[in-house]
Amino acid sequence: IDIAEIRGEFDGTLTVRDCVGPFLLRVGGWPGLTRAMVRRPSASLAAAARRDRDRLKELLVGGVLRGRQVAQVEAIGELFAEQVEASWLRTDTMERLRWHQRAGHRIVLVSASLSPYLRPLGRRLGVDDVLCAEPMRAGDHFADGLDGGNCRAEEKVRRLDAWLAARSWQDATVWAYGDSAGD
């Protein structure tokens, strides 16, 4: 492959707003989000004091999704992906994504967004792969936390490097887009 086109981020780069919070709200409602925030108060306070966004996200995602059936959450994710595609995508970056597709570039979304909605959205957009935050699973239910940690900053680079190496594409030209230092 001559060129791999990589989207560095989803929220704010491809979309006009953050998606993690609205998705968790869709799954758990306000009661679920509130329970997730107070379920482990000492861990939440420690993470907040350290400004550890990754740990806070892990606690919140685990608090909302833990114990829920994977199929149920993925069905909500499919509907959420439809909503994002219909109303939340940025026109300018979607035009750029389509340009890369027309040029025959491989498109990989690399994001801290959650797999239950980002994978279906990736299919809808016709991208080649999605590397993102994966909620922990235990059989057919979600467990506590994120499998492999949050996909941001250095973790994005690590996952992308592994993805390229698995295809023997280490010499590919990479186009990356993002809107924050974590991208």
Task: Report residues per predicted region.
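Short, compositionally biased "basic patch" segments
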Residues: 43-71, 129-134
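Metal-dependent phosphoesterase signature
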Residues: 56-92
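Conserved active-site and cofactor/substrate-binding residues in soluble primary-metabolism enzymes
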Residues: 18, 68, 155
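Acidic/polar active-site rim loop that often engages polyanionic ligands
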Residues: 20, 54-58, 139-145
